[in-house]
Amino acid sequence: MKFSAILTALTATIATVAGYETSGKPHTVDILIDYSIKETPEISQTDVANWVNGQKYTLEYVVNNNEETEIAVVGVTGQFKNPVTNQIVTNLTTGQVGPIAVAPGESIKFEQIVDVDLIPDNYELIPHVFVAHDDLIKVIPCRGQLASIVDAAVSFFDPRLIFLELVLLATFGGIAYFVYEIWGKQYLRGTAPVKVPVKKSGSPVAVKEASPVGSASGFDESWIPEAHLKKNKKKA
């Protein structure tokens, strides 16, 4: 196999694969590829992987070369499909691998990191491995893996949530201060009780009580004119 020509073309792996996929014919290869999820190795192809948006998951591949000639693993990609309609939802970023040469009857391992950022739903992940074989870059699809993707639960102590809470608190505080300055002060001034000053009365004037002037008749004679009193006395 002319690996020198293949390795020279590795910088254009994606373009080469695209040309092969559109114009090339299918080739039967005796290459077995399987993978497991590093974070949840107990998940098999019959199980459903529970993934969270914003997290990264590592696929650990094992490639077995049962061909009579040497092969080379040169890249990996994949896609998320709708498991019901089989329509492609999104493609994974194509990553270059090695190249890693695999002798006949041998196996190698490599990893692929998958960034999960999808609308919460059920998907089927189908990875694809690029293999150089017989002077061609061949795309070998792997088994599908069902995955249920959900959004991450927001913690009360999440820095993003704390920042949002501070922003809202500052906003409401500013609005409250503005309302108080515009209407609050005037309202409080209009409803506050007014203290009326009490005028103090002057010092009490002592009233001298007139001593009653007694008379034989038994009534007060102080108000009777003196001339009249003298006249009455003469008559008496």
Swiss-Prot record:
It is a single-pass type I membrane protein. Its main location: endoplasmic reticulum. The keyword Membrane applies. This is Increased recombination centers protein 22-2. GO terms for cellular component: endoplasmic reticulum membrane. It comes from the Eukaryota. Is probably involved in a pathway contributing to genomic integrity. The chain crosses the membrane at residues 162-182. It is found in: Endoplasmic reticulum membrane. It comes from Candida tropicalis (strain ATCC MYA-3404 / T1) (Yeast). Residues 1-19 form the signal peptide. Keywords: Endoplasmic reticulum, Membrane, Signal, Transmembrane, Transmembrane helix. The keyword Signal applies. Residues 20-161 are lumenal. Belongs to the IRC22 family. It holds the Pfam family TRAP_alpha. Residues 183-236 are cytoplasmic. PANTHER family: TRANSLOCON-ASSOCIATED PROTEIN SUBUNIT ALPHA, TRANSLOCON-ASSOCIATED PROTEIN, ALPHA SUBUNIT.
